[in-house]
């Protein structure tokens, strides 16, 4: 971490879905260069929280700041934010290749006068080179000419992550990004996230069901069940007592591993 300025700051966030209280009075912040996981049972509001933080769904109350600005006023800084949703719904008959999809994440205007971009990447970097490197980093380069409608679930996850990597980001938000990926694939993903965090200064916020992987790889954990049950380093937040308070009786951490 290079400083104590929060990349993301959430205060008093409450979200209703109709008359249902999905998220209640959630506050937390992310410091630069950290990987924070949100864990909790099904229906706990994890995906709802992430969508509200990104201003994708309305919130009932609360404030959200990203890069020190209100989320609604991000403007041109929005390209420094990457998001990989839990479910990517698309028409499988749509004629677009993997490389074309990843290329949609490239913003040629973003690099103009952007010091963050200039420091990490060459100014003369071409879109095709950026797409190729993103696919290599996610072990999906061999899929570049394949139609996205023919991809398996695991392959699509790699391609969507490449879409996020085609531009340098300061904050990467992942919603169950590794669900359905085999053990080796998940390990590869976490190794890549660690590289992005340590070498390039990315900050990661992820929703995950895999308690074991979170315990081994994340810096902080936020246990959620509508409201925050606990938060802290994995060895504290994932204690048996805290997991019981979060998931309820009958919980076994081994049910939440690959």
Which stretches of residues belong to each language-model region?
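H-loop (His-switch) and adjacent beta-strand-loop-beta switch element
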Residues: 220-234
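H-loop/switch region of ABC-family ATPase nucleotide-binding domains
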Residues: 208-209
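Conserved ABC ATPase "signature" region
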Residues: 103, 115-143
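Catalytic Walker B motif of ABC-type/P-loop ATPase nucleotide-binding domains
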Residues: 172-176
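Helix-to-loop junction immediately C-terminal to a conserved catalytic motif
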Residues: 54
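Conserved ABC transporter NBD signature motif
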Residues: 62-79
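Conserved ABC ATPase signature
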Residues: 147-151
